[in-house]
């Protein structure tokens, strides 16, 4: 049941990102997707990697997002097609409730290929996955530059009123 809940949270967060006109609700959806993704990673046995990912996300991307939305903020944020979101959310939640069987007892570790890799998590991150770590850092740098470039020339900025 916990996997259904995590997957429903991921789905609801991604629909919130997709349907939101304001960056505030988009960031809320991204936080919801990131938290549920890290929870899913930790349930599969990769808790150290999940912790590193959530610290990178909260420490890096949310700071960039707060800075960029402080420059170009809306006065009245809104979500487009709110009725569609409610219908879609109710359909997904009702599907999860109808498919839930309390007699199902599934262990994550009962799968043959899932192992607990907490003991080798940090060494894998820095030794064999060092290239991916550098690519992730480069992507964060590009996202910072893109956010700053997009918000630099905005005519309707909250700071211009000050």
From Swiss-Prot:
It is found in: Mitochondrion membrane. Its EC number is 7.1.1.2. It is a multi-pass membrane protein. It comes from Patiria pectinifera. The keyword Membrane applies. It comes from the Eukaryota. Signal peptide: none annotated. The chain crosses the membrane at residues 1-21, 46-66, 84-104, 130-150. The keyword Transmembrane applies. GO terms for cellular component: mitochondrial membrane. Gene3D superfamilies: NADH-ubiquinone/plastoquinone oxidoreductase chain 6, subunit NuoJ. Belongs to the complex I subunit 6 family. Pfam families: Oxidored_q3. This is NADH-ubiquinone oxidoreductase chain 6. Its main location: mitochondrion. Keywords: Electron transport, Membrane, Mitochondrion, NAD, Respiratory chain, Translocase, Transmembrane, Transmembrane helix, Transport, Ubiquinone. InterPro entries: ComplexI_Subunit6, NADH_UbQ/plastoQ_OxRdtase_su6, Nuo/plastoQ_OxRdtase_6_NuoJ. Core subunit of the mitochondrial membrane respiratory chain NADH dehydrogenase (Complex I) that is believed to belong to the minimal assembly required for catalysis. Complex I functions in the transfer of electrons from NADH to the respiratory chain. The immediate electron acceptor for the enzyme is believed to be ubiquinone. It catalyses: a ubiquinone + NADH + 5 H(+)(in) = a ubiquinol + NAD(+) + 4 H(+)(out). One of its GO terms (molecular function) is NADH dehydrogenase (ubiquinone) activity.
């Amino acid at each position: 049941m916990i996997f259904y809940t995590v997957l429903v949270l991921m789905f609801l967060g991604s629909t919130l990102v997709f349907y939101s006109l304001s960056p505030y609700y988009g960031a809320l959806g991204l936080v919801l997707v990131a938290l549920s993704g890290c929870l899913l990673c930790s349930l599969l046995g990769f808790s150290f990697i999940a912790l590193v990912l959530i610290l990178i996300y909260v420490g890096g991307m949310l700071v960039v997002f707060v800075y960029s939305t402080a420059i170009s903020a809306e006065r009245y944020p809104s979500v487009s097609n709110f009725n569609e979101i409610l219908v879609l959310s109710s359909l997904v939640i009702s599907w999860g409730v109808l498919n839930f069987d309390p007699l199902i007892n599934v262990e994550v570790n009962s799968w043959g290929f899932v192992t607990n890799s907490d003991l080798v998590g940090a060494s894998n991150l820095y030794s064999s996955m060092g290239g991916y770590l550098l690519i992730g850092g480069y992507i964060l740098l590009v996202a910072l530059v893109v956010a700053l470039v997009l918000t630099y020339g905005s005519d309707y900025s909250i700071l211009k009123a000050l």
